Amino acid sequence: MTDTAPTDITTATDITTATGAATGTGRGPAATARGHAALAKTQVLIEALPWLSRFQGATIVIKYGGNAMTEPALRAAFAADIVFLRYSGLRVVVVHGGGPQITAHLARLGVESTFVGGLRVTTPETMDVVRMVLLGQVNRDVVGLVNDHGPFAVGLSGEDANLFTARRRPAIVDGQEVDVGLVGDIVEVRAETVDALLDSGKVPVVASVARGIDGGVYNVNADTAAAELAVALGATKLVVLTDVEGLYADWPTSDEVLSELSITELEQLLPTLAAGMIPKMEACRRAVRGGVPQAHVLDGRVPHAVLLEIFTDDGIGTLITPDRDTANRVAPAAPTAYSGGRP
């Protein structure tokens, strides 16, 4: 037998139909069905709730690069993610490089890019182009995309307020040091300016150049810069966007992605990694060893990858944690009124 509502009981459809007729809105049964279909979207919001509570007020440093920086749809999605995080009460810092853009601009000038030991040979003339592209093009583009949603992003470089100080770094080839010009290692971070911007509700967007201890200007690795800044800020998370799904268990034999590693497990794997992943995983290692509780490597080719990692139970990519916290991802419990949801 099919159950039906008693004739003396007003159903939800009756109320909706009557209300629509009375108000002229036309919200009849079809509108009700659409409303019920939209209920599925609430599950996404409910899943995000404990994570929103946990990370309210947390500082997150995101290294932005790869396809997420070059494909228009991914660039727009990334900017929307940043604004969503800001509205959700997180303190967000973006650190970027711009290797492909620098190479393209040098090519237009008829200058061939040369790399030694994975480092760009950076002459004074090349450094002029690096600064011009990173500060005048890439940084302004990122700031503009975020500010399409409101006056949030502020662009700066590692030179500003002596944010990053670097010393000259040689490349190592066959165990020998090779001079690669104005390439530096960060030796000091003064994060007061970034902290002040975060306190005022802004999103600092930082280009990866640094002032040298000798007064010069140096090209620094953006992955390293993001890690050093995360440590200096006492960040809760470092997120590194890449063009792969995460850290593979046994590439190229297998495409299985390691969802989580302890810092010790990562250090054991580092010597075996492909050259392109070493700077990114070394940045994660540096951040976690420096006190950042979590470091993530995410596939920047996935739209809204940052939101998927932070606000869903499963997450994506590879998570690096301290040795004391190697449990699988589990959604945090809802905060008590006393805790206020602080991480």
From Swiss-Prot:
The protein's annotated pathway: Amino-acid biosynthesis; L-arginine biosynthesis; N(2)-acetyl-L-ornithine from L-glutamate: step 2/4
Gene Ontology MF terms: acetylglutamate kinase activity; ATP binding
Annotated CDD domains: AAK_NAGK-C (cd04250)
EC numbers on record: 2.7.2.8
GO BP annotation list: arginine biosynthetic process via ornithine; L-arginine biosynthetic process
Disulfide-linked positions: none
Gene Ontology CC: cytoplasm
Annotated positions for site Transition state stabilizer: 63, 280
Keywords carried by this UniProt record: Amino-acid biosynthesis, Arginine biosynthesis, ATP-binding, Cytoplasm, Kinase, Nucleotide-binding, Transferase
Coiled coil: none
Main location: cytoplasm
Catalytic activity, as annotated: N-acetyl-L-glutamate + ATP = N-acetyl-L-glutamyl 5-phosphate + ADP
Binding locations of substrate: 98-99, 120, 219
Biological role stated in the UniProt entry: Catalyzes the ATP-dependent phosphorylation of N-acetyl-L-glutamate.
HAMAP family, alphabetized: ArgB
Similarity comment: Belongs to the acetylglutamate kinase family. ArgB subfamily.
Protein's UniProt name: Acetylglutamate kinase
